[in-house]
Amino acid sequence: MHIRTMALVLFAGAGQLLAQAALQPAQTTVPTLEEVRKTMGIPSQGDVRGQQDAVGFASKPEQMARVWELSITPPLPEKLGEAPPPGVAGVICPHDDYIFAGRVYRQVLPLVTAKTVVLVGVFHRYRRFGSHDVLVFDSYKAWRTPDGDVPVAGIREEMLALLPKGDFVRDNAAHDSEHSLEALVYWLRHMRPDLQIVPVIVPAMGFARMQELAGRLASVLAQEVTRHRWQFGRDVAVVISSDAVHYGADFNYTPYGDGGVDAYVKACEQDRSLLRGPLAGPVTTAKVEQFFSTCVNPEQPSEYRLTWCGRFSIPFGMLLLERTNAALGLPTPIGHPIAYGTSISLPELPVRDVGLGQTAQANLYHFVGYPAVAFTVGE
């Protein structure tokens, strides 16, 4: 999702709507928790995280029920391959407005059936928080959803106790400012009421640092999986949040011209090539690095090459999956591209009558891609 509610512009201090995928200027003062909560659709309270976006995402049970009901109605998103059976080890799912992306969410999230889900999200505003080269966790005990609160799994504290202190920070304001995980949690909770989560958002970092952090988090996650006698897919899964290309002048990304049919076709084909290329088949370090280097300048990771907002969440999440499975003595995870859509490829879900809407324009000069990938434990 690329523009939140009007209140978010308070961070920018200039009154200008900023696309989330666009490069954001550095901010001298880190937003306070109080400032961030003023931008939330439903502010966090006490030990429970609230909701950043109450326009593009469901905030009431009847809204979530309607989205769920309608998201399986035709026309369906473009099919890239056969979906594996439910019980997958991980997925990549978009996080744009339900009105645009709901049908793509529905193609991939029901494949996740585990009770415990490690959520790997985008940190869109990492520059404003001065965050880089660390993993960002929260301290909340639960997250609010339309269907009821979701507890944070106890393994979060167990894992953080084992990680080097320099590998992570805990920042509730950062998580309150971010929408990329809440969008997915609401679907997961709707499908499984006993869901528990471990949320983490990933700011900018180089690939070498990413490998270090993923390796150490994988090691402690594998310890917890072993201690609890869990199985990947059955009991625990990794869910990665990311939209695909953000095309248009607002995103500072117009390699095929300002927009129009030809630019749209070329941008979508570029997305498909990534989904069928480094995101497909056995997960290897070389393929993960290929994706990383396609999206960012490896020498200056904050510089976009291709505007996938999950330029850090996807490679980190894939490395986490691969290294956790290796630590458990399991086969290499296999990527299965399932579906692809964009903010203009399908009709809107008819949910405006229950209070859902859009947070940004969607047209041939301003569009966002939606990837759907599942990961299974290979044979």
Give the ranges of each region predicted by the language model.
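Intrinsically disordered, low-complexity segments enriched in small/polar residues
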Residues: F11-G13, V88, P333
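N-terminal secretory signal peptides that target proteins for export/translocation
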Residues: M1-H2
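Bacterial N-terminal signal peptides
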Residues: T5-Q16
